Regions:
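Ankyrin repeat A-helix N-terminal signature
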Residues: 47-52, 80-86, 113-119, 147-153, ...
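Intrinsically disordered, low-complexity regulatory segments in ankyrin-centric signaling systems
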Residues: 2, 28-63, 72-75, 95, ...
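Start-of-repeat signature of ankyrin repeats
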Residues: 41, 74, 107, 140-141, ...
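Ankyrin repeat structural motif
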Residues: 53-61, 86-94, 119-128, 153-161, ...
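Ankyrin-repeat-protein effector appendages
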Residues: 2-4, 30-44, 163, 183, ...
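Ankyrin-repeat inter-repeat connecting loop/turn
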Residues: 67, 100, 133-134, 167, ...
Length: 234
C-alpha cells in the first residue's frame, strides 16, 4: 500500500505530465512564420511587407493591389510584416486599408503574432491604428492576452489590458490568462509581473481549471511562493 505522504507527490507528477502533454500539443499548433524559402518566393505586397519596403507598398496600393491577398499558409501581407517586425510596413498596410482582424491558417491575427513575439513596438503600432485586442484566436479559442500570459510577456500583457483585452476569457483547455501565467510559466520574475498585471487589472481569481483548481491552488501546487503571496493578499 502506498504511504499517505506519497499521494501529494503523485498528484504533482500527474499534473506535471498533463501540462507537458498540453505544451507539446500547443507547440504542434504554434504560429508558423514564413520560411526563408517562402520569403524568397514572395512577390508583390508579400515581398514588400517582408522587406519593409514602404515605398513599394505605396506604389502597389496605388495600382489597387489586393491588400488581403493570401500566401499558401493563409498569411496576408500584414501577417508577414508583423512576423518580420517591419513596423513601417505594418503602418503602411493598415493605413491603406488592410484587414486588421484577418486570421491565417492557424487562426492567428497580427496582434497575437506580435504578442507571442514579445514585439511591443509593433503591437503598439497595431493597437494605435485600431487593431483589436479582443479577438478570439488560435486553435485553442484563446486570445492574444492568454498567449502573452503563457509566455510571461509582461509588457505585452500590460498593453493588451490597457487596450481592453478580455481578462477572464476561458480557452478550450479551460484556462484563463491568469491560469496560464501559472501553469505554463516558470514562476520567475516575468511571469510574476504578468500575474501582478492581471490581478491589479481585476482578473477573476475564482475561475478554475477543469479540475476545479483556482489560481491560488495552482500556484501552491507548483511551489511558486511569490505568486502564492500575491494571490493570498486578494
Amino acid at each position: 500500500m502506498q504511504k499517505p505522504q506519497s499521494i501529494p507527490i503523485l498528484r504533482a507528477l500527474h499534473t506535471a505530465c498533463v501540462v507537458v502533454g498540453l505544451l507539446a500539443s500547443q507547440m504542434s499548433h504554434a504560429q508558423v512564420a514564413p520560411s526563408q524559402a517562402e520569403v524568397a518566393g514572395y512577390r508583390g505586397l508579400h515581398a514588400a511587407a517582408a522587406r519593409g519596403d514602404v515605398a513599394k507598398i505605396e506604389r502597389l496600393v496605388a495600382t489597387k493591389a489586393d491588400l488581403n491577398v493570401r500566401d499558401a499558409y493563409g498569411r496576408t501581407p500584414l501577417h508577414v510584416a508583423t512576423f518580420a517586425k517591419q513596423n513601417g510596413a505594418v503602418r503602411a498596410l493598415i493605413q491603406a486599408g488592410a484587414d486588421k482582424s484577418a486570421l491565417e491558417n492557424d487562426r492567428y491575427d497580427a496582434v497575437t503574432i506580435a504578442a507571442v513575439a514579445d514585439d511591443e513596438e509593433t503591437l503598439r503600432t497595431l493597437l494605435s491604428l485600431g487593431a483589436s485586442a479582443k479577438l478570439m484566436t488560435s486553435r485553442y479559442d484563446g486570445t492574444a492576452l492568454i498567449a502573452a500570459a503563457h509566455l510571461g510577456h509582461d509588457g505585452v500583457v500590460r498593453q493588451l489590458i490597457a487596450a481592453g483585452a478580455p481578462l477572464d476569457h476561458v480557452n478550450n483547455l479551460h484556462w484563463t490568462a491568469t491560469i496560464e501565467a501559472i501553469v505554463l510559466g516558470n514562476g520567475g520574475p516575468r511571469h510574476q509581473a504578468t500575474l501582478r498585471a492581471l490581478v491589479d487589472a481585476g482578473a477573476n481569481l475564482q475561475l478554475t481549471d477543469r479540475h476545479g483548481k483556482t489560481p491560488l491552488a495552482l500556484a501552491r501546487s507548483y511551489g511558486y511562493a511569490e505568486m502564492v503571496q500575491m494571490l493570498e493578499k486578494r
